Amino acid sequence: LVDERMSTEGTGLSLGLSNN
């Protein structure tokens, strides 16, 4: 999931990590 998010938006990674 992280890879997919990273591909879509660099900020997504940070948000995903915070969410997790």
Swiss-Prot record:
GO cellular component labels: chloroplast thylakoid membrane; photosystem II
Membrane topology field: Single-pass membrane protein
InterPro entries: PSII_PsbW_class2 (IPR009806)
Cell compartment(s), UniProt: Plastid, Chloroplast thylakoid membrane
Stated family: Belongs to the psbW family.
Subunit (UniProt): Part of the photosystem II complex. PSII is composed of 1 copy each of membrane proteins PsbA, PsbB, PsbC, PsbD, numerous small proteins, at least 3 peripheral proteins of the oxygen-evolving complex and a large number of cofactors. It forms dimeric complexes.
Name listed for the protein in its UniProt record: Photosystem II reaction center W protein
Organism name: Triticum aestivum (Wheat)
